[in-house]
Amino acid sequence: MARKKKKKHEDEHVDESWLVPYADILTLLLALFIVLYASSSIDAAKFQMLSKSFNEVFTGGTGVLDYSSVTPPENESDGIDEVKKEKEEKEKNKKEKEKAADQEELENVKSQVEKFIKDKKLEHQLETKMTSEGLLITIKDSIFFDSGKATIRKEDVPLAKEISNLLVINPPRNIIISGHTDNMPIKNSEFQSNWHLSVMRAVNFMGLLIENPKLDAKVFSAKGYGEYKPVASNKTAEGRSKNRRVEVLILPRGAAETNEK
């Protein structure tokens, strides 16, 4: 009887040798990602050292990381600077245009005041001057006040109201009213000093101006300087006459209300 051969069943063997290089590749990729991530938060010197170490460990020599830099490329840095420069230039041009428009508006107000002075034949009582602080309108005290008094004469109230119309500007500007005197001691019981007199003249004149419903009282302020800001010598009658005055300063837009003359 023939002997029945026993069937051999051999287990199939799967070749897994590819796993070793695959694992090495994953390790290298992980190391590369770690380096790239770390490079964003370390300085250039440390990055070069770390790069060199990884290249020596994994490749045994010079690699692509040896001469990399964490600083932005030169052309990228230039682009950022160019954008910043362009923005600053636009801002500068905008401010220059606003300043030019502001100056033009003040010049227009000055022209209107000068026309008013000419029409009213007040060349010896009022004058205008453009200064670095704004448009200055100077009014001699004799046009509104009696000597040593701070109340505007009744007959001159209409003139003060006409002047108020010249100050109607849209949008409103800050306006400072200041009183000034000569250095002659005041000789009445109403005021303790020239300083007190100058303050009250400024306040009373300002009060008449802001009775104009077209003017905003919030943009007005009053000051008194007494004899301490003369524009002429107090040694002559003519000089003292020039020093006795009320000034209206129309400020540039954006100027502080506390702007000192």
Swiss-Prot record:
Domain OmpA-like stretches: 132-254
Main localization of the protein described in the UniProt heading: membrane
GO biological process: bacterial-type flagellum-dependent cell motility; chemotaxis
Membrane topology (Extracellular): 42-261
Biased composition (Basic and acidic residues): 81-102
Alphabetical list of InterPro entries matching this protein: Bact_OuterMem_StrucFunc (IPR050330), MotB-like_N_dom (IPR025713), OmpA-like (IPR006665), OmpA-like_sf (IPR036737)
Entry keyword Metal-binding: no
Topological domain ranges for the Cytoplasmic compartment: 1-19
Family: Belongs to the MotB family.
Function statement: MotA and MotB comprise the stator element of the flagellar motor complex. Required for the rotation of the flagellar motor. Might be a linker that fastens the torque-generating machinery to the cell wall.
Protein name per its UniProtKB record: Motility protein B
